[in-house]
Amino acid sequence: MAFVLSEEQQMLRDSARSFADERLPISQLRVLRAKGEGFDGTTWREMAELGFIGVLIPEEFGGSAFGYIGLGQVLEAQGRTIAASPLLSTALIGASAFVIAGSQAQKETYLPQIASGDLIMALAVDEGPHHDPSHISLTATKSAGGYTLSGDKRYVVDGVEAGLLIVAARTSGGESDANGITLFLVQGDAKGVSRTPLKTLDAHAAVGGAPLLDRRGLQFARSCARNHRWHFGGDIPHIRA
């Protein structure tokens, strides 16, 4: 099967490559790494103005609706320069979650914020050293006003700067049961969320954390020997997606 880009897709590809070469060179990654920063906010805003962040988002929510082929051109362009940006976690994973599974209210609230570059997202799934989305032990139990999430997540890409998290939590079943997993929306600054930056080979911004909740969901501070994790605890209202 022949794969040929449309004229508009070719223009998007060329624009994305030019931008990545000029504004997201590998030298920028080295500077950010030296500063301990995950990405440059000014460059991210420029990406939003050029429409790169809203490629998957319908026009009614501020995007350009170029689809996955279009976004693929932007991702490929940034991959060529090892660009430091939360494009994958926000423009692909975050936007897809709302476009595919979000309620109308969630789309109206979050998609415009993603397209404008105002909202950075992160997906918190893995809990062990390897990717295994069915192995979830972080629990979500019903409580007054919503749910209480308690547990740890590892290697949350772009989690350092994320304002909104998509968290996979277990609402039923056993630890390795493929069923009984629910996705929750959690504000990055929610009470009970603790983040610890991780050093990665490509200097990309990922996080871990430390537990701050006991079994009853009441906050207290305690030390923990486990590193490279992200802990969630506290009552999370309005959130199942």
Model regions and ranges:
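A structural signal for short hydrophobic beta-strand segments in well-ordered beta-sheet cores
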Residues: 138-141
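A short core secondary-structure module
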Residues: 150-194
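Internal helix-loop-helix
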Residues: 49-108, 112-117, 157-164
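A short, Trp-centered hydrophobic/proline-enriched beta-strand micro-motif
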Residues: 117-128
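Short Gly/Pro-enriched turn/cap motifs at secondary-structure boundaries
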Residues: 87, 128-131, 155-158, 174-175, ...
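Glycine-rich beta->alpha junctions and the first turn(s) of the following alpha-helix
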Residues: 2-14, 80, 193-241
